[in-house]
Amino acid sequence: MQKQHQRQHKVELVANLKSQFDSAKALLICDYKGLSVKKLEALRNKARIQGIKVQVIKNTLAHIAMKEVGCADLDLKETNVFLWGDDQIALSKLVFDFQKEHKDHFVLKAGLFDKESVSVAHVEAVSKLPSKEELMGMLLSVWTAPARYFVTGLDNLRKAKEEN
């Protein structure tokens, strides 16, 4: 009875992982060997704020879930922590910022963006892109520039007329 209950729990876990992996736009797999629980919890807390899921998953269960999603080409060995979410840039920034702080114990191993395998170099390049909020700020600045220059020009014209 105990084994059957454990098996049912694993089947439910794989089904849950499959649905989450299937809906995620980005998934990164990192080696966390030697990382303390406290530091892993700090990563989870940072991720939670950004809507990113962080979970240590048994490799065999993760492999089954990945296979069902159509991403079976990943070689899952050693100790892995899985991070996934909908924002590729935020996820990449989170992983590389955390990796800078803990380079001896936290290393990006593999990544999937829109269920396509991507290299570590690609993920690093994405991590250097501006975030969605930064891009919106840049765009807003570009849109408001003509009005800002027009108002500045009118103000300069008013000052010039006052001096004369």
Swiss-Prot record:
CDD domains xrefs: Ribosomal_L10 (cd05797)
Annotated PROSITE patterns: RIBOSOMAL_L10 (PS01109)
GO MF annotation, one: large ribosomal subunit rRNA binding
Entry keyword set: Ribonucleoprotein, Ribosomal protein, RNA-binding, rRNA-binding
Highest taxon, organism lineage: Bacteria
InterPro entries recorded: Ribosomal_uL10, Ribosomal_uL10-like_sf, Ribosomal_uL10_bac, Ribosomal_uL10_bac_type, Ribosomal_uL10_CS_bac
Entries under Gene3D superfamilies matching the protein: 3.30.70.1730
Membrane-traversing stretches: none
Keyword Metal-binding: no
Gene Ontology CC annotations of this record: large ribosomal subunit
Coiled coil: none
Single biological process term from Gene Ontology: translation
Record note on quaternary structure: Part of the ribosomal stalk of the 50S ribosomal subunit. The N-terminus interacts with L11 and the large rRNA to form the base of the stalk. The C-terminus forms an elongated spine to which L12 dimers bind in a sequential fashion forming a multimeric L10(L12)X complex.
Function: Forms part of the ribosomal stalk, playing a central role in the interaction of the ribosome with GTP-bound translation factors.
HAMAP family registered for this protein in UniProt: Ribosomal_uL10 (MF_00362)
NCBIfam families linked: PRK00099.1-1
Similarity-based family: Belongs to the universal ribosomal protein uL10 family.
Protein known as: Large ribosomal subunit protein uL10
